[in-house]
Amino acid sequence: MKSRFSTVDLRAVLAELNASLLGMRVNNVYDVDNKTYLIRLQKPDFKATLLLESGIRIHTTEFEWPKNMMPSSFAMKCRKHLKSRRLVSAKQLGVDRIVDFQFGSDEAAYHLIIELYDRGNIVLTDYEYLILNILRFRTDEADDVKFAVRERYPIDHARAAEPLLTLERLTEVIAAAPKGEVLKRVLNPLLPYGPALIEHCLIESGFSGNAKVDEKLESKDIEKILVCVQRAEDYLRKTSNFNGKGYIIQKREAKPSLDADKPAEDILTYEEFHPFLFSQHLQCPYIEFESFDKAVDEFYSKIEGQKIDLKALQQEKQALKKLDNVRKDHENRLEALQQAQEIDKLKGELIEMNLQIVDRAIQVVRSALANQIDWTEIGVIVKEAQAQGDPVACAIKELKLQTNHVTMLLRNPYLLSEEEDGDGDASIENSDAEAPKGKKKKQKNKQLQKPQKNKPLLVDVDLSLSAYANAKKYYDHKRYAAKKTQRTVEAAEKAFKSAEKKTKQTLKEVQTVTSIQKARKVYWFEKFLWFISSENYLIIGGRDQQQNEIIVKRYLTPGDIYVHADLHGATSCVIKNPTGEPIPPRTLTEAGTMALCYSAAWDARVITSAWWVYHHQVSKTAPTGEYLTTGSFMIRGKKNFLPPSYLMMGFSFLFKVDESCVWRHRGERKVRVQDEDMETLTSCTSELMAEEMEQLEGGDSSEEETEELHGMPGDVELMTQVDQEDIAVHSGRDELSSEDGEAKAVTKDQEPIGEMKEEEEDTFEYPDTTIDLSHLQSQRPLQKLAPREESLNSNDSKSQGRRHLSAKERREMKKKKLPCESGDLEVIEEKDKERESAVHTEAYQNTSKNVAAGQPMKRGQKSKMKKMKEKYKDQDDEDRELIMKLLASAGSNKEEKGKKGKKGKPKDEPVKKPPQKPRGGQRVLDVVKEPPSLQVLAHDLQDLAVDDPHDDKEEHDLDQQGNEENLFDSLTGQPHPEDVLMFAIPICAPYTIMTNYKYKVKLTPGVQKKGKAAKTALNSFMHSKEATAREKDLFRSVKDTDLSRNIPGKVKVSAPNLLHVKRK
């Protein structure tokens, strides 16, 4: 396969570039890899991309080549000097494969020099050819030239054009060439035309394309060769103003097939590209293009895809070759056994035919051995007898006394001597070759011919046996070989069927993986750390400081959210939000988990909080006198801290489904409200609790407590919605400090029913008689709230329930509405002081004190408090805080209390704004205005959704996000059996988003390397009973490098039945 330009190719493409690109200005310079660069050129009505590959090629391209995320230093230097400059000329230096591109004129000119020979090079120089930057530093010792920055590029050292070879010089060259060398190889180093053009000219002059140098070349032949050289020079001149066509020469490869009846398929692959259609290619398949530049672009752009085809073809050939080798091996074994049977049978028959001679020979040798004659003397005696014409001695060909055998040459005595060929000795079979041993024996046995009965045969005769016994021994060998042949045939059939089945499976896998790799589309976000949240938001993060910089500069757009953690190595995460609507809390928490897991917290196993800000709060402008390094940004304004996240990631696969199947998966990752998400929430919470908090497995109330609960009519609604564990959580939550320093304690005082009802109607929008279940999981969205009318209508039935009011709220209400006695007021103020002084004490102790101070405990509460103290006696403050953060138990009630407190204040009293502290419960949506809580806005949105049953939010989002959301809908972790699956993409994301995924494993900090962990997870998926054949094929097609690239550090893999899969 042709891989680089020849001189003819270079001149042809330069002629086309000069005709199309001169006068265009450089828009930008990009690097594809360390050897390939793209120069974007433009003029008012035309744009073009010039591709340069050091040592290989130069051409324009219409294909989209992948560019490096961060431009290299060479590309940056080219941008600095070449950007916005006009391309003035593109010329070849001498006849060497060196191109000089000049950008700009006179002293403002810069030269970009590309070397297309040897290892290649790209050099940027100024107008005096002083090197400003160079791709590959080197020293040319032969010319004493150093290629380095600030050195002068030696343009005068390029190979100059030489006069045509003379007849005398050509004769000398051919005479000095080694005999048998191909003629075009002899001429190629002397001429600048390239082997293809030389071969074409040789064919045109009547030579063979592979003509060799030998003694038969006469003077007239050398003259013909000289004519060939002149023709090649004419072609080279044509390329100076080339405006012809381009040709890609194809190679036809036969695709192997297991079916003999099926016609063989041909695969056409690109082999060469040329500006002319040469004579040697007339019989080959080829593709014609309107220009050579387009032919080269097509050749190199499709070569990668064809490499996949060729690799698959080689794998198929290798698989079929193995099957063919198995078949031939069994055939050779059977043939060797058949021959062994025939030889043993013939030897037995020859011994029977020559009984007297064999018996006589056995007796003579036995007698000599019995007389203790030396073995050497016995040999001498045999030779003397042979010289005298003794028939017995003539039959003995060799004495093998060390093995107690004699080799005899036996003939069929019933055949006339004329029937025996004179060269019978040449076909004598060696009796030692009873069975093939080793590869050499196998090769010899392939050439063995059938033994002929009329030919003499060498037979080994055992001296310890009689002639008949020796014949019987050979017949026994024959019978044993027959049985062995039968067993071999049966085993061969089984082995061949197994090999054939395995080969078919291999061929199928190769074809499937090849088709998947071709269909596989690499999305723009895969170069980053990424995942799609449980609510269909794309979250991307940088792998390093450079990618962090790029993400903020290029991909942080208005409406997006920036998420980070104050830890070393933490990635900068961006939540893409094309609609501009408020990001749900669950997605924010998942992005925070990602920021933490891709930081030093993973290896240190530290649980902490991430934070988020709006896009306009992120800036690269540093304060006066300070400098921001790469990947560092200035955050202006308030940071909104998220709840602490557990270091828990998951590994899974997203399947790309066909467009016809996308409708099945719309809404899989929509923003869910309480009624829709309760089942998912419960299962996910139970899974997390079981895996991470085994100490909280209990919590069921006893029969006595259940009876006590049912015995309290005023608390029926409350107690039937929460278990004792929830009570403990609420008890610990009640005394958590608020943002402004006040302790928002939940009071258990029971107000009179009439007063309760009156305050409820005037002050509160919702009666506090139900338990908000959003604390069960910190990531889930806020639940729906009942409409005001419904809550007002249900006041009578709910007025007996207990409301939890802070001391401040009750104080304000009593000032506003009820004249209270001074004693009662003093009691309330004392309670306030007690709560403020006890902010950081244990939650269940505070709760018990407050209940005791307010009023006597109700029936059953004393025993409950005693059991709660016993259950949580081993918990310290840190453990309790972690549990509270996991369950997010204070989230929704705080917001409700805040709203209630504001409505309870007089209108002329300003609402007190809490200070900005790093708490997950408060998130800012607008920095300019008074910051409403994110949860409050989410409640308002959900209220609208409740009021309008025909919510068209999903359709609105679809219109806003367009193709991007369609893409996310086509990537699913829950493939349907009837889906048409295109390919699979490995994904590493917070484990909470994978609740409904078909395949998933949990990753936590551990000691296993990520490559091995990815293979363990893949092996688990492959052995899953639910895995279909297509899904397994998709798993196999994923490259090993793509599997583990997003896994954070060293991990521990956890999944159901993982140990059972490993044993398999």
UniProtKB/Swiss-Prot annotation:
Organism: Mus musculus (Mouse)
Cell inner membrane listed as a keyword: no
Record text on subunit structure and interactions: Component of the ribosome quality control complex (RQC), composed of the E3 ubiquitin ligase LTN1, TCF25 and NEMF associated with the 60S ribosomal subunit. The complex probably also contains VCP/p97 and its ubiquitin-binding cofactors. Interacts (via its N-terminus) with XPO1.
Subcellular location as annotated: Cytoplasm, Cytosol; Nucleus
Sections of the chain in a coiled coil: 296-359, 481-512, 858-882
Residue list for modification Phosphothreonine: 7
InterPro entries on file: NFACT-C, NFACT_RNA-bd, RQC_Subunit_NEMF
Keyword Transmembrane in annotation: no
Extent of Basic and acidic residues compositional bias: 731-756, 828-839, 947-959
Name under which the protein is recorded: Ribosome quality control complex subunit NEMF
